[in-house]
Each structure stands twice: as C-alpha cells, then as structure tokens.
Amino acid sequence: MPSTPTLIFIVIFFLVSVASMLQNGFMIIVLGREWMRNRALPAVDMIVASLASSRFCLHGIAILNNFLASFDFCYQANFVGILWDFINTLILWLTAWLAIFYCVKISSFSHPVLFWLKWRISQLVPRLLLVSLIMGGLSAIISATGNIIANQMIISQGFHGNCTFGHMSLDFYRYYYLSHAVLMWFTPFFLFLVSIIFLMFSLYRHVEKMRGHRPGPWDPRTQAHTMALKSLTVFITFYILFFLALIISSTKSKTMHSYWYWVREIIIYTGIFLNSIILVLSNPKLRKALKMRF
C-alpha cells in the first residue's frame, strides 16, 4: 500500500493530467472547427493544433503507463512506453518548429537566410510536421529495440513474472535511454534555444531602436515580441524541467511506489499544462473562443 504522501501526489498527477487533456481537447475542437469551416489552417495554427493533439495523447498515455506499471504489468507498460516515446519526441520537434516560426516571423534581423525563411516558412510547415512524425517514428524504433534487448537480458538473468531488474539490465536501461534521449532530443532543444536567443536579441534591438521615438509600451511590434517571449519562456521552462526529470529517472531504479517518482511526474506534466495555457492566451482564435465560453 503506497504511503499517504505518495497517494496525494498520485491524485495530483491524475487531476493535472485530466485538466490538461480537457484543455488540449478544447484547443483541438476550436482549431478543428476552424479547419472544417475554412478547409485550411494558418501555418502557426497547424503547429499549435498538432501540439495540442500530441499533448492530449501524451497525457492519456502517461496515465495508462503509470496505471499498468503500478500493477506490475511491465511488458504492457513497456509497449505503452514506446508510444510515449514517439509522442514525446513528436512534441519536442513541434515545439522547436513553433519557436523557429516565431523567430522567423517576428525577429527583425536582416540576414538573407531569415528573409528567405520569412517568405517560405509558412509553405514549409507541412513538411516540418512530416519531419516531426519521422523523427518520432525513429525514436520509437530505437526505444522498441532497447526494450527487446533489456527483456532478453532480464530473461537471461532469471527474472520472470515481475518487474524486477537485474544489475546488468538496470545499467543498460540507464545508459541506453540516456544516450537515446541525448541523440533524439538534444537537436530540437538546441534549435529551440537558438530561436529564443535570436528573439531576445531581436526584442532588445527593437526596443533600443524605438526608444528614441518613444512609441509607448503598446507599440505593436514590441507587443508581438513580448507575447512570443512569454510563450517561449514557458516552453524553455518545460524543456529544462523535463531534462532534469529525465536525468533523475535515468539514475534511479524502480521508484513507482516512491513519492519522488510522482513529484517528478507532476513537475513534467504541470509544465506541459502551463505551456498549453500560454498557447491558448497567445492565440487570437483560442483566446476569443475561451472568452465566449466564459
């Protein structure tokens, strides 16, 4: 029987996940109706809709995976974990594309590459979404391969019928999945980080340039920079929390019945929840639909 703190954190995790599923479901419905009405979506809304759909699935998979692992359905949980890996990689790449889209559209740098991207980025979005799916699929294949190897190691060490890991299989899980995370997730994180840095410099240059003209704090371009930076600040917070949680999880053994495991889960999915709130508030269509509902 889990301890009282563990039960409390389990309930909090479940409530956060359900709230986030409702939130992302709202985004899917609003943008889905927009797509049905116009038979098309603006490029940025395509990315946001894809993010909302992926996050909706991620929370559902996280609930199912933790439920299965709690009852020692380890092989089933490992299969669901492969789906989690696919969705999570997809989300990381979609977040990187959204950051790049904001950077290209809003930044005021005069580099020829940025000029070219500013005119082409909207047409490139469908291809970028396809790249995200491909990277997610590749990540799932790597994860499935790791599960197969680890299961063979568990069987060879004589562990059957439960979730017990031998020393060799546990070390393999730690190093294999940490290497997998670095390989598959560092690139979108790097792209995301570079985009944020460019946006920050662009905002600083714009504010300094316009300060002499004193347009006031409601200058449209300054507002656009500020709104994008608010969204991307939450994005990068989610990234940092996620990677810290990944390091913690890769250096510990079975922690399902420890409240620290659930604290880590709450941190990860609360970050996603807060990130989705910023997406709703920064998107005119979603913000308008939210005001009409409430």
Curated annotation (Swiss-Prot):
Domain of life where this protein originates: Eukaryota
Database matches in InterPro entries: TAS2R
Gene Ontology CC: membrane
Gene3D superfamilies per record: Rhodopsin 7-helix transmembrane proteins
Cytoplasmic compartment residues: 29-43, 102-128, 202-227, 282-294
Pfam family for this entry, one: TAS2R
The keyword Transferase is assigned to this record: no
Record-level Gene Ontology MF annotations: bitter taste receptor activity; G protein-coupled receptor activity
Membrane-topology annotation of the record: Multi-pass membrane protein
Residues glycosylated per entry: N162
Location(s) in or outside the cell: Membrane
Transmembrane segments: 8-28, 44-64, 81-101, 129-149, 181-201, 228-248, 261-281
UniProt keyword annotations, A-Z: G-protein coupled receptor, Glycoprotein, Membrane, Receptor, Sensory transduction, Taste, Transducer, Transmembrane, Transmembrane helix
Ranges of the Extracellular topological domain: 1-7, 65-80, 150-180, 249-260
Function as written in the Swiss-Prot or TrEMBL entry: Putative taste receptor which may play a role in the perception of bitterness.
Other remarks on this protein: Several bitter taste receptors are expressed in a single taste receptor cell.
Family per record: Belongs to the G-protein coupled receptor T2R family.
Protein name as annotated: Taste receptor type 2 member 143
Source organism per UniProt: Rattus norvegicus
Gene behind the chain: Tas2r143
